[in-house]
A protein has these predicted regions:
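Conserved non-catalytic scaffold segment of RNase H-like nuclease domains
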Residues: 1-76, 101-122, 126
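Generic recognition of well-ordered alpha-helical segments
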Residues: 84-87, 114, 138
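Acidic two-metal-ion nuclease catalytic site recognized across multiple nuclease folds
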Residues: 117, 133-158
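Beta-strand segments within the central parallel beta-sheet cores of soluble alpha/beta enzyme folds
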Residues: 77-80, 154
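Short, function-defining helix-loop hinge/capping sites that tune catalysis or transport
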Residues: 30, 66, 88-91, 139
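Acidic donor-binding loop at a coil-to-helix junction in glycosyltransferase catalytic cores
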Residues: 130
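Short alpha-helix plus adjacent loop in nuclease-associated cores
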Residues: 19, 79-105
Length: 158
């Protein structure tokens, strides 16, 4: 099941937390340290493959937080909808001559743009649960479009 935690950051960036994510000083002041949610987080991840859009965010954040908290590293399987979308739409940036000949950049791999290509309704971004649901909807559309029910999960994770 879906779940999220707001944790107190080690380095406060009020401009990002409030503007992008809507997390206020009140939220941060009453939130636990990462160490308090590490055990339930690891339990929630055990035996599961994490679904994300742009794995570097989750892997870098969780990797850094676990390293800072425990001194250990954290490796976990991830299915990345951005990576799956890049397989269908490889990144292409045409040079001057190619542009002159009418070549276009590859489409954006951002979550909202990828969802739009599959005719999935827009959503309000930058809330953990909403982003998770939006990513799950995109994943279902990608599976129906690009893969078969027999596709092993090992072909999808990175």
């Amino acid at each position: 099941g879906a779940r999220h935690w707001v944790v107190r950051p080690n380095h406060v960036r009020p401009d990002i937390q409030t503007t992008i994510h809507g997390i206020t000083h009140t939220h941060m002041g009453t939130s636990p340290d990462f160490s308090a949610i590490l055990e339930p987080l690891l339990q929630a991840m055990t035996g599961r493959v994490v679904l994300v859009h742009y794995n570097r965010i989750e892997r870098d954040f969780l990797g850094r937080a676990v390293l800072d908290t425990t001194g250990d590293t954290l490796e976990f399987p991830v299915v990345d909808t951005m990576e799956l979308e890049s397989r269908k739409h490889p990144v292409f940036r045409p040079n001057f001559i190619q542009r002159w000949m009418g070549e276009k950049d590859s489409p954006s791999l951002r979550l909202a743009h990828a969802r739009e290509r599959y005719n999935i309704p827009p959503y309000r971004p930058h809330h953990a649960l909403t982003d998770a649901l939006a990513t799950a909807e995109l994943f279902l559309a990608q599976m129906a479009d690009q893969f078969t029910p027999d596709t092993p999960v090992s072909d999808l994770w990175i």
